[in-house]
């Protein structure tokens, strides 16, 4: 296979992966925002997770068999795994709502979910423009934007826990919601970790 074509396969796979993650994020926001009416849609998040696992497997197979890669081999590996973490956390959060018998959504849930969707959309654009990362400033702009979104999420997370402990210091859902909010915060961290890999790629080429 010609060198250019072989290198392009990684960008194609990563772009497709980013698109699937955005699809999952749209479903995730719907599940969180309209919960508990969306309880029946929670299993769909596992479907997205499985599909994304296949994307990672394909990327790793190509990585193993390729002599030439468009960016460092370790960066492609780290990027694929970081992107996979995003969907893993979405599924864990959605499944947790069912597992812990949650019957009411707290207001910070949709706030953090929408921040996640915004971050994922930025990641999608970032990955779409990644082939031109040495010249296209939008790559770094989106990577930095994701970091700012994660900072916003930290504030929502802190306020969510503060309100939870104030209103239900000994309530039955305190432990449950602490865990769920932790995972929501970890989800935004996963988005920033993904952007962080790209920030590193761009800086190494500067």
Regions found by a protein language model. Name each.
Residues 1-206:
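Cytosolic, long alpha-helical scaffolding segments
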């Amino acid at each position: 296979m010609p060198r250019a074509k072989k290198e392009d396969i990684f960008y194609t796979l990563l772009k497709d992966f980013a698109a699937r993650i955005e699809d999952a994020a749209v479903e995730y926001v719907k599940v969180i925002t309209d919960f508990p009416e969306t309880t029946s849609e929670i299993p769909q998040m596992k479907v997205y997770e499985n599909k994304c696992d296949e994307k990672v497997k394909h990327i790793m197979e190509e990585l193993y068999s390729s002599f030439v890669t468009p960016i460092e081999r370790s960066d492609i590996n780290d990027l694929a795994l970081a992107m996979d973490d995003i969907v893993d956390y979405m599924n864990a959060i959605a499944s947790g709502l069912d597992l812990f018998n949650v019957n009411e959504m707290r207001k910070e849930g949709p706030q953090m979910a929408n921040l996640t969707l915004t971050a994922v959309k930025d990641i999608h654009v970032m990955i779409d423009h990644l082939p031109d990362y040495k010249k296209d400033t939008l790559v770094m702009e989106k990577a930095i934007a994701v970091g700012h979104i994660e900072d916003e999420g930290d504030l929502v997370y802190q306020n969510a826990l503060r309100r939870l402990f104030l209103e239900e210091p000994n309530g039955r859902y305190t432990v449950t919601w602490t865990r769920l909010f932790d995972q929501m915060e970890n989800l935004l961290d996963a988005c920033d970790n993904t952007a962080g890999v790209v920030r590193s790629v761009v800086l190494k080429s500067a």
